[in-house]
């Protein structure tokens, strides 16, 4: 629990600093960095024990912050909304290996979700491996993960 508290303090401090960015508050890159760092730290905390776990948190936070900042620098709210809706649709209905694309006509950014292997986790939930690809300003970024179907029908990323 102490580790989670430290992560929350870092996330809160970062968001407070980002709020000082000016009248608009937190920008897209700051938001991406914050969310990527927090997600990376949380993922990193799942590995190792003691000092090894702290190393995992640090590495996860750093990698997540870098990737999140790069993606957030170019993605706007509409991009994120389109990507999330497409992810939900792809995970629920698309056959493994098929690409389900989204495209923002206002800025030309686009991406696609490729669901892969479907399996049941230890609690019986349906889960899927997937690849998320986004192209922002002509630069492609890929992320790999797993998501599980929740009782309400929504898919939640588990790593």
From Swiss-Prot:
<dbReference type="GO" id="GO:0009279">
    <property type="term" value="C:cell outer membrane"/>
</dbReference>
<dbReference type="Pfam" id="PF05433">
    <property type="entry name" value="Rick_17kDa_Anti"/>
</dbReference>
<keyword id="KW-0732">Signal</keyword>
<comment type="similarity">
    <text>Belongs to the rickettsiale 17 kDa surface antigen family.</text>
</comment>
<keyword id="KW-0564">Palmitate</keyword>
<feature type="signal peptide">
    <location>
        <begin position="1"/>
        <end position="19"/>
    </location>
</feature>
<dbReference type="InterPro" id="IPR008816">
    <property type="entry name" value="Gly_zipper_2TM_dom"/>
</dbReference>
<protein>
    <recommendedName>
        <fullName>17 kDa surface antigen</fullName>
    </recommendedName>
</protein>
<dbReference type="InterPro" id="IPR032635">
    <property type="entry name" value="Anti_2"/>
</dbReference>
<keyword id="KW-0998">Cell outer membrane</keyword>
<keyword id="KW-0472">Membrane</keyword>
<feature type="lipid moiety-binding region" description="N-palmitoyl cysteine">
    <location>
        <position position="20"/>
    </location>
</feature>
<feature type="lipid moiety-binding region" description="S-diacylglycerol cysteine">
    <location>
        <position position="20"/>
    </location>
</feature>
<keyword id="KW-0449">Lipoprotein</keyword>
<dbReference type="InterPro" id="IPR016364">
    <property type="entry name" value="Surface_antigen_Rickettsia"/>
</dbReference>
<dbReference type="Pfam" id="PF16998">
    <property type="entry name" value="17kDa_Anti_2"/>
</dbReference>
